[in-house]
Amino acid sequence: MSCSEQSKKDAADFFLKANQSFVQKNYTEALRLYDEAIDKNPEFSDAYLNKGLCLLKLNRPADAYEVLTEAIKVDPSFVQANLVRAETALVLGKLIDADNDLRVIEKEYKDSSRFFLVRGNLSDAKGQPSLSISDYDRALQLDKANVEALVNRGAIYYKQGDIVLAQKDFKDALAIRPSQIEALNNLGLIAIHENKLDDAVNMFDRILNLNPANAFALNNKGYAYLKLGKLEEASKLIDRSLDIDPRNGYALRNMGIYYQKSGQADKALIEFKKAIDIAEPVDELYGLTGKLLLEKNDKVAACKIWKQGIVLKDPIAIAEFEKNCK
């Protein structure tokens, strides 16, 4: 056996061992073994691809993107690497790069449910919900068990206010995968919206049984408890959520609501303003902040904040501005 053949054999051995570690979720060891495989055979495109997948599991998307680019350089016809790189580009907010990769492989992937899922995600990131829904529809025609397509389509329906269709998608997703956290979370939020607060708490508890440190479920369960009048239990849950993710605008808003309901208006205002400073959309935040300012007899500041809320289609801000600022 020549040196070259021996190196390729060694590379293949490392690759198989790496795949075993990957399946066992030992991603650090898998990464080391993929590097060994690439070191033995620098043109081993599958090893680059799997190394990229490994880096994604380790929450290193920028590194994954570079490795996937190497895979495509080694084998420009390796369309699977383009698809994974498109997904990675989406995570990194590189929408044009994701679009370019998807265009390159469109013909080869015309019957791929995953391709249409990724393209649907791209359209959603671009703010094109109708294109997104169309691609999720196609993904589900090709694979009716595509849980991510169900959840993501449901999320768009939810944002559009089509609660019935959203609920159906989330329930269908859970019928396939009962541990699907986004579906459980969104059904919990819908239950809050419908004032079915015990149902909501049950959904969030199902998430917390799977992962006791899920910041969104802790916060949302806390919000349900605020609505139920269980203020102290609510504050503990929201506080734990903020320990895990201090920049969750919804948790800051909810802590503000807790302080407001507890008669601590100054502390409530501090939390609301922290949420506003993050500059991410949070339902009813501007409306609630303005109401608190008005209670403190600062009508000018209240009207100013409501005016900002109108731009964000905050229903409380719209109603309060109409009532108090004309």
Predicted features, each with a name:
Residues C3, K9-A12, E284-K326:
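Terminal, low-structured helical/coil segments at or just beyond the last alpha-helical repeat
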Residues Q24-L33, L58-E70, V91-V104, K126-R138, ...:
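Structural signature of tandem alpha-helical TPR/SEL1-like repeats
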Residues D10-A12, S45-D46, V79-Q80, S112-R114, ...:
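Helix-start (N-cap) detector for alpha-helical repeat units in TPR-like alpha-solenoids
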Residues K40, V74, K107-Y109, L142, ...:
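Structural marker of alpha-solenoid helical repeat scaffolds
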Residues M1-N50, K57-A62, E66-T69, K73, ...:
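N-terminal leader/linker segments that initiate helical-solenoid repeat arrays
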Residues N50, V84, V118, N152, ...:
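Canonical tetratricopeptide repeat
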Residues S179-E271:
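Eukaryotic tandem repeat interaction scaffolds
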